[in-house]
């Protein structure tokens, strides 16, 4: 029966007989409950949609409020000697986050006089989360909630539900994406991710120590470098203290612009800040925080010695970590002592910020090497770099003198939205693209994120759409959304945009034709964010996978009988039996034996 192996035939059978969109979610082992009665008669179905059940389970295992699967279609490809049939489906999953009042904006009578304090407090809460030491939840056992009876609750899922409400979770939400990342990492990745975070923290403490350093600092607090040029361990030991609110509160007298530069320089590691703005250290250029640079060692400029021995020192540092390396590298060649002219040495000494830049480049190179050691599953940093976009937006606002209640509110709201978008897209990427068994067989065709801001009565304030096609759609979406939201922060409180401002905004967000209505973008830019009570996030994506055909003659015979009986009932305008109806197996229709499906073995005759 050729119809069994064609897209049109499978579509007809799926619609009227098997209902594959539901049947594929059942246990289809021979004799299982789902196979009893019509139309399977204790046997698996004649087709199997590879990956469909896993796709649905992936969506069910996440904190989506609603899930829909539409446009289940079958397409056929016929080439000389081969025939394939694929299934495709559009998945739409969504959930709503409560964008209620953030505690920094609650009960503030004189907002203008406390604006700087609020801005620095908001920055401090965020940077503490971005540089906090990562520690995955550990332990075994079950969790029981008083209002959920005897049903066990996963702690991770419970926390994600908690993070949906900004009015309830407040600053606890900051760093949610990174915390979930390390929660899903293996033992080796945990060590590497914690080391990377420790290096960023140490570098931030190092550069912040300079601008916070007061005259008359005790000599004992200084750490002399280059420590035989193997200074990384001493660097981490000296600056490994976690960044906390107490540390940052001591910077109240420091210009916010300078603090933001330090944050961007640390958080953007191992990449260079896009505007290449490095914080400028106090006093001489040969001084870095509480590190004191010796002018020379054995007649050589110290930064030059550090630079020449950088690779060797980094390799030794990684080798000492309690992890097995993915591949052993060739040790760098020994440093060749070359004579350096006195003039060259003098030039080396007076390069502005040479010491600080060498420290950052060393830390950046080490972080890059550690990221290469991560497993493929943990290496997807593209979902966790969005914080840099928002710190840079704050830096631009500070430079423009445009820090006000509206820009701060939007900064917090969009940061909150980005945490959720990053967490969800990373989850989908891990399950649908990074899981090799699924990704080898099922293809991601396109992905879309829809953001609907709603007021307290549920009305839509504005709606944004981002689309991407191809296998890398999830990561490309994250990059676009992060850049888009960060660029729109500067428009808060400016009302409707002028013609030239519209062109500038479209350029800043890298607008694409498939990014929704331009009027919605302009409405988003001009809206007063105090009107927004909640934000609905919808994640839509289309996947395509193969359909496999049974080669068991018994299943083929049952299918022939079922299809013939169903066709007869349809021709007579009679209803078809309900699934699992207890009716006898219809007789085998008369006529010649159907040809074998592609690849099937002929039946043995005795």
UniProtKB/Swiss-Prot annotation:
Placement of sequence motif Nuclear localization signal: 320-329
Coiled-coil annotated residue ranges, if any: none
GO CC annotations on file: host cell nuclear matrix
GO MF assignments: double-stranded DNA binding; single-stranded DNA binding
Keywords, ordered alphabetically: Covalent protein-DNA linkage, DNA replication, DNA-binding, Host nucleus, Phosphoprotein, Viral DNA replication
Localization per record: Host nucleus matrix
Ribosomal protein as UniProt keyword: no
Posttranslational modification: Preterminal protein is used to replicate viral genome, upon genomic encapsidation it is processed first into iTP and finally into TP by adenovirus protease.
Cleavage, annotated site positions: 140-141, 289-290
Principal subcellular localisation of the protein: host cell
One of the protein's GO biological processes: DNA replication
Modified residues (O-(5'-phospho-DNA)-serine): 515
Site (Priming of strand displacement replication by covalently linking the first nucleotide of the new DNA chain): 515
InterPro entries according to UniProt: Adeno_preterminal
Keyword Transcription regulation belongs to the record: no
Pfam families: Adeno_terminal (PF02459)
Biased composition (Pro residues): 584-600
Subunit structure: Heterodimer with the polymerase; this heterodimer binds to bp 9 to 18 of the genome. Interacts with host POU2F1; POU2F1 binds to the auxiliary sequences in the inverted terminal repeats and tethers the pTP-POL heterodimer to the origin DNA thereby participating in the assembly of the pre-initiation complex (POL-TP-DBP-NFIA-POU2F1).
Function of the protein: Protein covalently bound to the viral DNA that acts as a primer for viral genomic replication by DNA strand displacement. Assembles on the viral origin of replication in an initiation complex with viral polymerase, DBP, host NFIA and host POU2F1/OCT1. The terminal protein stimulates the template activity over 20 fold compared to protein-free templates. Neo-synthesized viral genomes are linked to two preterminal proteins, one for each 5' end.
Assigned protein family: Belongs to the adenoviridae terminal protein family.
Protein name as it appears in the record: Preterminal protein
Taxonomic path: Viruses, Varidnaviria, Bamfordvirae, Preplasmiviricota, Tectiliviricetes
């Amino acid at each position: 029966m050729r119809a069994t192996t064609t897209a049109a035939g499978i579509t007809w059978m799926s619609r009227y007989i098997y209902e594959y969109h539901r049947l594929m979610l059942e246990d289809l082992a021979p004799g299982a409950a789902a196979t009893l009665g019509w139309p399977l008669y204790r046997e698996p179905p004649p087709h199997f949609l590879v990956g469909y059940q896993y796709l649905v389970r992936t969506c069910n295992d996440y904190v989506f409020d609603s899930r829909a699967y539409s446009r289940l279609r079958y397409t056929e490809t016929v080439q000389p000697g081969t025939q394939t049939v694929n299934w495709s489906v559009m998945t739409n999953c969504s959930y709503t986050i409560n964008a209620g009042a953030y505690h920094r904006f609650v009960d503030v009578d004189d907002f203008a006089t406390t604006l700087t304090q609020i801005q620095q407090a908001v920055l401090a809460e965020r940077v503490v989360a971005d540089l906090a030491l990562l520690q995955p939840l550990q332990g075994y056992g079950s969790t029981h909630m008083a209002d959920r009876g005897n049903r066990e609750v996963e702690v991770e899922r419970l926390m994600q539900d908690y993070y949906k409400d900004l009015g309830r979770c407040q600053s606890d939400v900051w760093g949610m994406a990174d915390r979930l990342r390390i929660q899903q990492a293996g033992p080796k990745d945990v060590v590497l991710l914690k080391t990377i975070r420790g290096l960023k923290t140490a570098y931030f403490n190092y550069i912040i120590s300079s601008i916070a350093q007061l005259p008359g600092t005790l000599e004992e607090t200084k750490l002399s470098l280059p420590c035989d040029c193997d200074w990384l361990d001493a660097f981490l030991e000296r600056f490994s203290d976690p960044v906390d609110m107490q540390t940052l509160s001591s910077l109240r007298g420091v210009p916010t612009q300078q603090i933001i530069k330090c944050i961007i320089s640390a958080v953007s590691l191992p990449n260079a800040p896009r505007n290449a703005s490095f914080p400028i250290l106090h006093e001489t250029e040969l001084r870095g925080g509480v590190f004191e640079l010796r002018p020379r060692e054995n007649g050589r400029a110290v930064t030059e010695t550090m630079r020449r021995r950088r690779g060797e020192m980094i390799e030794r540092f990684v080798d000492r970590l309690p992890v097995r390396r993915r591949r052993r590298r060739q040790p760098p060649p020994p440093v060749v002592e070359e004579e350096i002219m006195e003039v060259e040495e003098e030039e080396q000494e007076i390069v502005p910020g040479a010491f600080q830049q060498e420290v950052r480049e060393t830390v950046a190179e080490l972080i890059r090497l550690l990221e290469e050691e991560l497993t493929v599953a943990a290496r997807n940093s593209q979902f966790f770099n969005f914080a840099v976009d928002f710190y840079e937006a704050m830096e631009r606002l500070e430079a423009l003198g445009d820090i006000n209640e509206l820009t701060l509110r939007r900064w917090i709201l969009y940061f909150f939205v980005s945490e959720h978008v990053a967490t969800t897209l990373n989850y989908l990427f891990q399950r649908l693209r990074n899981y090799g068994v699924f990704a080898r067989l099922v293809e991601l065709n396109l992905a879309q994120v829809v953001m609907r801001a709603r007021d307290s009565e549920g009305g839509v304030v504005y709606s944004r759409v981002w689309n991407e096609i191809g296998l890398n759609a999830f990561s490309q979406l994250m990059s676009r959304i992060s850049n888009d939201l960060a660029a729109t922060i500067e428009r808060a409180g400016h009302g409707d945009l002028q013609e030239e401002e519209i062109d500038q905004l479209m350029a800043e967000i890298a607008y694409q034709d498939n990014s929704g209505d331009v009027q919605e973008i302009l409405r988003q830019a001009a809206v007063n964010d105090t009107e927004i009570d909640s934000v609905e996030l919808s994640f839509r994506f289309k996947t395509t996978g193969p359909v496999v055909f049974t080669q068991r003659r018994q299943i083929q015979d049952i299918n022939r009988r079922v299809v013939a009986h169903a066709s007869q009932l349809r021709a007579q305008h009679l209803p078809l039996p309900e699934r699992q109806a207890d009716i006898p197996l219809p007789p085998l229709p008369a006529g010649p034996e159907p040809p074998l499906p592609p690849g099937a073995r002929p039946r043995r005759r005795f």
